[in-house]
């Protein structure tokens, strides 16, 4: 089984791992109630989407 000839340096290891980060979710303010919600999704607080009430509470 092959093994690395040289030890991987901290810098090289960290450069490779820069792409292993989590993506930040796109949060927007709901125009109806003003609460923060995920973009292109129904608001959990007021149940509206694109100005229409889709979830009745």
UniProtKB/Swiss-Prot annotation:
The keyword Ribosomal protein applies. Keywords: Ribonucleoprotein, Ribosomal protein. GO terms for molecular function: structural constituent of ribosome. One of its GO terms (biological process) is translation. It comes from the Bacteria. Pfam families: Ribosomal_L32p (PF01783). One of its GO terms (cellular component) is large ribosomal subunit. Belongs to the bacterial ribosomal protein bL32 family. This is Large ribosomal subunit protein bL32. It comes from Halalkalibacterium halodurans (strain ATCC BAA-125 / DSM 18197 / FERM 7344 / JCM 9153 / C-125).
